[in-house]
Amino acid sequence: LTSLGIQESSRVAAAIFLIHILTLSLLILLGAFFVFFNGLDVLLSNFRLPTEGSLPRALLFGFAAAMLGISGFESSANFVEEQAEGVFPKTLRNMWIAVTIFNPGIAFLALALVPIPEVAQHQQTLLAHMGNLAGGPWLSVLISIDATLVLSGAVLTSFVGVTGLVRRMTL
């Protein structure tokens, strides 16, 4: 990456990643406090609602939707040749650990904080709405800013990935 002049971009991407992890951790922590102090009434009422179709179908669709939210796996493969021996498997492991912790945690909190009928009203800004419920307007704003940064990081990652792809195709 340094030879391509993208060293600064990798620092920006690392900063965006750190901010994102801290924001998600804060959402989970404050959401857990909210549920602890306000009870599980919303969660239990959400679990009582009937599912459309079967439970396996609901789990499949939920898993598929969660996979759409995972970014970075496809881009990290572009850097295999530039990484030291054994780094790429560690990178994948670390990404899977983060996804395994954050995705189920946030999904559980969504069920515990937001009544299902209310989800449709906030489908474009559900995490920000969860932040507003759990921590107030300041957390909602922080989550919105974080979302903007993450989208910017995705564009940056795509640029780096395309650059690697073009380099391999021209060799």
Residue ranges of model-derived segments:
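Membrane-water interface regions at transmembrane-helix termini and the short interhelical loops
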Residues: 1-19, 78-82
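Residue-level signal for alpha-helical transmembrane segments in multi-pass membrane proteins
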Residues: 1-4, 23-34, 105-109, 150-153
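Transmembrane alpha-helical segments of multi-pass membrane transport proteins and ion-pumping complexes
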Residues: 3, 66-74, 99, 103-108, ...
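Juxtamembrane loop-transmembrane helix junctions in multi-pass integral membrane proteins
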Residues: 4-11, 52-55, 87-90, 131-141
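Helix-loop-helix junctions that connect adjacent transmembrane segments
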Residues: 14-72, 78, 101, 111-125, ...
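Hydrophobic, membrane-embedded alpha-helices of multi-pass small-molecule transporters
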Residues: 49-94, 142-155
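TM-loop-TM module centered on a large, flexible mid-protein loop between adjacent transmembrane helices
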Residues: 91-153
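Juxtamembrane helix-loop transition segments at the membrane interface in multi-pass membrane proteins
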Residues: 163-171
